[in-house]
Design a protein with these regions (language model features):
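Short Lys/Arg-enriched alpha/beta "domain-start" segment
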Residues: 1-118, 125
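Membrane-associated alpha-helical segments
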Residues: 154-263, 268
Length: 270
């Protein structure tokens, strides 16, 4: 009979400080550190019980079914950058099942993955993909918020022919958000990178690619990139409008100063 485990992925913060967690977190009284990488800490509490902490704000848990205990563990990982004001922290966690059966052939299914054995390396491949998936959910929500803000600005332009009901600062914040999301996906989330083991083990690479396909990471990334291109183009247009408005204001100020200078000159002559 196949042994079944569940793995859960939670987005809890904008980022997690791995150094502080490694040195200070009370979670160390329950779990022992099994592996340390640049953007990842892997803890274990026994056979097939893992806790992975990613620098980009995601925690994955395997082999623990008690949701109350999971919630308590997440509270112990409080070192990092909190969500910004106005952000919704309730990103839905993702879950996926692992069926371990020495007699079965390994495969990636819709709601579970079949493995002959569950090694740490195989678990980390699944954990990596799920962590990226739940982080993409967060990015998708942020991009949707940014698109909504841009839609409101464009509606103002369409209705009034000028920017009404908004200010330069809010527009610049919207522009900056698109760049921040690109940076997050490519650098911190490392969406385009493959784990080192996939370069050394063909079976690991096949498993990783099948998992990415199942969670539609590549398709979702392309969809996000298309939306970000739209946001980028809209942002450039808005920056041009802001630049033109500032230039117009500057011209008016110069004209007023010249007029004042002429008035003082006339007063002096009189």
């Amino acid at each position: 009979m196949a042994a079944k485990l569940s793995i859960y992925a939670y987005y809890i913060k904008n980022s997690l400080n791995l150094t502080q967690i490694e040195q200070n977190s009370p979670v160390l009284s329950i779990f022992s550190l099994a592996r340390k990488e640049r953007n990842l800490l892997v803890f274990t509490a026994g056979e097939n019980q893992y806790l992975c902490v990613y620098a980009f704000g995601v925690v994955t848990v395997c082999g623990i079914e008690d949701k109350t205990r999971i919630g308590e563990l997440l509270k112990l990982l409080s070192y990092g950058e909190d969500l910004e004001e106005g952000q919704d922290p309730k990103i839905q966690p993702e879950d996926y099942a692992i069926a371990v059966d020495k007699e079965a052939s390994e495969s990636v299914e819709f709601d579970h993955v079949k493995l002959k054995t569950l090694t740490l390396e195989k678990f980390l491949l699944l954990s990596h993909v799920m962590a990226q998936s739940v982080a993409i959910d967060f990015v998708e929500r942020r991009i949707t918020d940014t698109q909504q803000a841009l839609e409101n600005i464009h509606s103002s332009l369409a209705s009034h022919g000028k920017l009404v009901g908004t200010n330069t600062r809010s527009i610049l914040k919207t522009v900056g958000m698109s760049g921040k999301m690109v940076y997050f996906m490519v650098t911190r989330l490392s969406l385009l990178d493959k784990p080192d083991i996939t370069w050394e083990d063909k079976d690991a690479e096949v498993l990783f690619l099948n998992l990415r396909k199942m969670f539609e990471l590549d398709d979702r990334f392309e969809a996000l990139r298309f939306k970000l291109e739209f946001i980028k183009d809209s942002s450039e247009t808005l920056m041009d409008i802001i630049g033109a408005r500032r230039a117009q204001v500057l011209e008016i100020i110069i004209i007023v100063l010249i007029a004042i200078e002429i008035i003082f000159a006339l007063i002096g002559i009189m």
